[in-house]
C-alpha cells in the first residue's frame, strides 16, 4: 500500500517550552507526550529544581522518552528559549483582558502545519499559576483549550499532549492517522 507523502517538517519546526515547572514528573510526562506525537525540541525556563531533567520522577514518567529529556535545554529566560523561533503561542486556561488573539489548539495546529516558514514555540506555564502576563503578551496567539468551563485546568502534561496531538494530526493530513498494528 502506497501512503501519500506527508509533510513532516512541523515535527522539527515546533518547540515546546515549559516555564518554571515545579514538578519534575510533569517534565517527564511532557517528554513522553512529545515523543508519542513525534516532537523532540523541549526547552525549560528556570525549572524549580536544577536537576529536573535527570530527577528520578522525570525519568520514570518519561517512560521511554529519556532521549527527549537528555536532548532538552535549560535556559534562564523566555528570550533564550525563543531563540530561533519566529512565532510563539502561549497556552493557558485563563483568558486575559489584554492578550494576543485567542485561538484553539486545532486552529493553530493547522496554521503551523501549513506555514512551513514558521519556526514556532508553544509555551506552557507552571502548574500552580500558569503563564505570567508578561510572557503571554510577547506571544502571537493565546491557545485556550476548550475544556469544561466548570473545571478547565488541565495538568501540564495533558495540555501538552492535546497540543502535540492536534499538531501531529495537522502535519499528517488526511489519510495518515492510522498507526501500525502492535506496540
What are these model-derived regions, one by one?
Residues 1-183:
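Post-transcriptional modification and biogenesis factors for structured RNAs
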Amino acid at each position: 500500500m502506497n501512503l501519500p507523502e506527508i509533510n513532516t517538517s512541523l515535527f522539527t519546526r515546533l518547540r515546546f517550552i515549559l516555564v518554571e515547572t515545579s514538578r519534575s514528573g510533569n517534565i517527564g510526562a511532557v517528554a513522553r507526550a512529545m515523543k508519542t506525537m513525534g516532537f523532540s525540541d523541549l526547552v525549560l525556563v528556570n525549572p524549580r529544581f536544577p536537576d529536573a531533567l535527570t530527577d528520578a520522577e522525570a525519568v520514570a514518567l518519561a517512560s521511554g522518552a529519556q532521549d527527549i529529556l537528555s536532548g532538552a535545554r535549560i535556559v534562564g529566560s523566555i528570550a533564550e528559549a525563543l531563540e530561533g523561533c519566529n512565532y510563539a503561542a502561549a497556552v493557558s486556561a485563563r483568558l486575559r483582558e489584554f492578550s494576543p488573539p485567542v485561538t484553539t489548539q486545532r486552529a493553530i495546529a493547522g496554521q503551523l502545519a501549513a506555514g512551513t516558514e514558521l519556526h514556532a514555540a508553544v509555551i506552557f506555564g507552571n502548574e500552580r499559576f500558569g503563564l505570567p502576563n508578561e510572557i503571554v503578551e510577547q506571544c502571537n496567539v493565546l491557545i485556550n483549550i476548550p475544556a469544561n468551563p466548570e473545571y478547565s485546568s488541565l495538568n501540564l502534561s495533558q495540555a501538552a499532549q492535546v497540543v502535540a496531538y492536534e499538531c501531529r494530526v495537522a502535519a499528517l493530513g488526511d489519510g495518515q492517522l492510522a498507526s501500525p498494528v502492535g506496540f
